[in-house]
Amino acid sequence: MLILHNISRDKHNSNYNTPQEVEQSDGPLSFDGVYYNVYLNQGLLEGRDVTLFVMGDHVGKTNKFDIGQPLERYCDWNQIMELVEIYNCRLGWHSWSHRDLTTLSEQEILREVIPPIPMDVFAYPYGKFNEKVIEAVKIAGFKEAYSVTEGDGSEYQRLRAYL
């Protein structure tokens, strides 16, 4: 599975992919945070296997927490659900606040990983996880979890690659 964040003609940094790069990519795609520019370029999702990883506290807001990145807006719930319905995207969870879960207590981890609606797939913020985090993800009912830093291919240690 490939990981993407933003779709833009202007490639500000590695968190941005051009529409042409997305069109030419092979395999399943995943979008972290579901930026509004994904919604604006939604035609690129047609016929693709796409997972949208949502961060609850940031839905409809900006990425102001993401120091060093250009300020961008995330989709709101209506836009996210429209993408799910029109393009048959899978809805995944990326925590409420996007904090490093490995630094939190067990109770805090559980609060972060339990989504507002049932979802089957989770993406670890910053790709970081440990046994406490994996256990919380299992308790929350997820069937799979993805990282961008490491993984052994098992259900809760699947690896995504940057496009």
Task: Explain the meaning of each model-derived region.
Residues 1-30, 35-42, 86, 103-163:
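C-terminal active-site subregion of NodB/CE4 polysaccharide deacetylases
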Residues 5, 94, 98:
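Histidine-centered divalent metal-coordination motifs
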Residues 36, 57-60, 97-99, 129:
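Short, catalytically relevant binding-site loops at active-site mouths
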Residues 39-57:
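A short alpha/beta connector and helix-capping loop motif
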Residues 43-48, 73-92, 138:
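Acidic (Asp/Glu)-rich catalytic clusters
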Residues 51-53, 92, 123, 145-146:
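Structural detector of well-ordered beta-strand residues that form the stable sheet scaffold
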Residues 60-75:
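Aromatic- and acidic-residue-enriched segments that line the glycan-binding/catalytic groove
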Residues 65-66, 101-103:
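Surface-exposed, active-site-proximal loop segments in enzymatic domains
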